[in-house]
């Protein structure tokens, strides 16, 4: 028994303490809290840019439709003619609703 106790006293195991592990977890959680809001802002910015691109596509398709058919284009007419999809029409409406719709060129 004495040999076992002396052996355990002599054998020093290198390991992290509980306090060190808690500090590491604290640092990781603080970094996580700093980066997550930035990721959501980036996602919103990408979505807005994508919808702005869809607006340009819809407006250019409306202009082409007006030139070919000699009548004003609407979202319904563009969809019926197969020039835009339902998702593009929805994105066009959402973008204009969000930005006030003052510069809207294509009506429903």
Curated annotation (Swiss-Prot):
**PTM remark:** Undergoes proteolytic cleavage.
Q: Where are the transmembrane segments?
A: 16-36
Give GO cellular component annotations, separated by semicolons.
cell surface; extracellular region; pilus; plasma membrane; type II protein secretion system complex
Q: Where in the cell is it found?
A: Cell membrane; Cell surface; Fimbrium; Secreted
Entry keyword Heme: no
> Keyword annotations for this protein?
Cell membrane, Competence, Fimbrium, Membrane, Methylation, Secreted, Signal, Transmembrane, Transmembrane helix
Record-linked InterPro entries: Bac_GSPG_pilin, ComGC, N_methyl_site, Pilin-like
Signal sequence extent? 1-13
| Main location (coarse class) | membrane
Q: Which residues carry this modification: N-methylphenylalanine?
A: 16
- Explain what induces or represses this protein's expression: Up-regulated by competence-stimulating peptide (CSP). Part of the putative comGA-comGB-comGC-comGD-comGE-comGF-comGG operon.
- What membrane topology term does the record carry? Single-pass membrane protein
Question: Which parts of this chain are annotated as the region May be involved in polymerization of ComGC?
Answer: 14-39
GO BP field: establishment of competence for transformation; protein secretion by the type II secretion system
Residue spans making up a coiled coil are none
Family affiliation: Belongs to the ComGC family.
What's its job? Major component of the type IV-like pilus (T4P) that plays a role in transformation. Transformation pili are dynamically extended and retracted, perhaps thereby promoting DNA uptake and transformation. Required for transformation. Required for DNA binding.
Note the subunit structure. The transformation pili are flexible filaments, consisting mainly of the major pilin ComGC and smaller amounts of the minor pilins, including at least ComGD, ComGF and ComGG, and perhaps ComGE. Homodimer. Forms higher-order multimers. Interacts with ComGG; the interaction is probably direct.
Q: What is this protein called?
A: Competence protein ComGC
Q: Taxonomic lineage of this organism?
A: Bacteria, Bacillati, Bacillota, Bacilli, Lactobacillales
